[in-house]
Amino acid sequence: MSSFTHFNDQGRAKMVDISDKKITVRTAIACSSILVTKEIFDKISHNEIGKGDVLAVAQIAGIMAAKRTSDIIPMCHPLLLKGVDVSFDWKQSEEQYRLLIEVKVKTEGSTGVEMEALTAASATALTVYDMCKAVDKGMIIGETYLLEKTGGKNGDYIRNS
């Protein structure tokens, strides 16, 4: 089992020792989405959701989630993040309204920020759901995935379309 970095010689979980890894600039971009009804789209667009400004609150939730990733993902190292940016874009087709979520995370350290970006994207989508569920519980959170990452000994990664 020693080929798995998160297991010790006894096959038990461990946090990987990163003290010998080189400190480099590391970035990650993760994406998610949430499919909503026209009613929810209109209410978000006109700031008519009873709980407040959905996108502003979801953006803050995403930033907070990135900062707290090591608290909820057991083997993630606590990181000093240099920046977190949560952005939104609407994609409309016929009667479908999809809120696209993109999260960019940056640090300078000895481990990557992929999990921070993915956690932030997930928390952002979950926050939109939470704030809008009184209007309609049928919203669908879409795929959450890593779009790209830079830095580290394994090099850069860019997701194929």
Swiss-Prot record:
Catalytic activity: (8S)-3',8-cyclo-7,8-dihydroguanosine 5'-triphosphate = cyclic pyranopterin phosphate + diphosphate
Pathway of action: Cofactor biosynthesis; molybdopterin biosynthesis
Lineage: Bacteria, Bacillati, Bacillota, Bacilli, Bacillales
Protein name: Cyclic pyranopterin monophosphate synthase
UniProt keyword Ribosomal protein present: no
GO terms, biological process: Mo-molybdopterin cofactor biosynthetic process
Residues binding substrate: M75, C76, H77, M115, E116
Superkingdom in the source lineage: Bacteria
Organism, scientific name: Bacillus mycoides (strain KBAB4)
Role summary: Catalyzes the conversion of (8S)-3',8-cyclo-7,8-dihydroguanosine 5'-triphosphate to cyclic pyranopterin monophosphate (cPMP).
